Amino acid sequence: MVTCMDVNNLKLDGMELVAGESGLRRMVSWTYLVQTRPFEEHMNRGNFALIVVDYVRFDFKEVKKAIVELNDLGISGLAISVVDDKEFIPKSIIKKADELSLPLFYVRWKGASFVDISQSIGNLIMETNIMNKRTGDYLYNLLFGYNVNDRYVEKISGQFGLDFS
């Protein structure tokens, strides 16, 4: 399971947590680029939402409405980038994220990319899923395997950092 804390721990260039620290344990299922309403038709619970404030589709007034709606739909966290870094996220939005315990990240416009952020989060989710499957397979083989011997247990346990000696 990947959480917003894991996303924050990636220390992605140009991305910083600005609010909602109390919600960092929210589970992240995937990323979602916020563009089209109604949001519920395009996203799933646990999505990590990404919004670009471009002053055409989204301005900060629209973001303030969207943050409540997206939180009600179960997003895990929210990252906001502002075209050309024209301004920082308003204090009212930061306050709302804190009230909702919604992790809110600021993404620098220049040098940071939603594609890179999405890819990094996706890779983290996939790596975690693979590790969880390997752990599950290992435990299954320990419990129900027909040909489990001490050498197998020692070899596989070492891959998980376990020492049964």
Regions found by a protein language model. Give the residues of each.
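Alpha-helical/coil-rich non-catalytic "connector" segments in signaling and regulatory proteins
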Residues: M1-S165
